[in-house]
Design a protein with these regions (language model features):
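Active-site-proximal flexible loops/turns
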Residues: 9, 74, 154
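Acidic/histidine-enriched segments that form metal/cofactor-coordinating
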Residues: 51, 77-78, 84-182
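Residue-level marker of intrinsically disordered, low-complexity segments enriched
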Residues: 12-14, 33, 141-142
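Sec-dependent N-terminal signal peptides
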Residues: 3-16
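His/Glu-rich zincin catalytic helix
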Residues: 17-86, 108-111, 117-127, 181-182
Length: 182
């Protein structure tokens, strides 16, 4: 009982010192939620978009599509040539990445603070004007297969870390039993 009390007090003390993050939340007419948070300690801006779609939305026997589309949406848009996404980001002093989980797919770009409009434009391009063609499908299919080989198939404990060895047993009927990577 004494250990429980000390543990509880420890976690209570952590919560007392936790900082609340100030943000503004807007819901646009199209249903898009926009969260704004200003933090002036670094001269950078991050534009991120989270889509509420992930591996849980797939069907048994056909997994990995959310992750695959995460990759495809870097292939180019109506106004961004194929293969130029990363060039635009890096030539403007930025970095970017994306990831997929059971519940969502997340993209972000971090730029110097004077490039907010560029980040917003790039994410709007990804959302409104993606180009998905056979070249991109073939390219990203190989990229995703290589990612699976590196992270799961050929990595010690990879199947444990990425859940492919455990999740089907933990979540017998729940959508989380499906592999994210495919």
């Amino acid at each position: 009982m004494k250990n429980f009390l000390y543990t509880s007090l420890f976690f209570l003390a952590l919560n007392i010192n936790a900082q609340l993050i100030d943000y503004e939340l807007y819901t646009l007419d199209n249903g898009l939620d926009v969260i704004l948070h200003q933090e002036n300690s670094s001269p950078v801006v991050t534009v991120s978009v989270m889509y509420h779609v992930g591996a849980k939305d797939e069907v048994d026997g056909r997994t990995g599509f959310a992750h695959f589309f995460e990759h495809l949406l870097f292939e180019g848009t109506k106004n961004i040539e194929r293969g130029k996404w990363f060039d635009i980001v890096s030539s403007n002093g930025g970095s970017n990445n994306a990831n997929t989980s059971h519940d969502r797919t997340y993209y972000y770009e971090t730029f110097p603070s004077n490039s907010l409009e560029l980040g917003l434009w790039m994410e709007s391009e990804r959302m409104l004007h993606p180009i998905i063609n056979q070249i991109g499908v073939d390219t990203q299919n190989e990229v995703v297969k290589e990612e699976k080989r590196q992270r799961i198939d050929n990595a010690p404990y990879g199947a444990l870390i990425y859940g492919t060895a455990v999740d089907p047993y933990l979540y017998k009927k729940h959508p989380y039993r499906r592999s994210i990577i495919g």
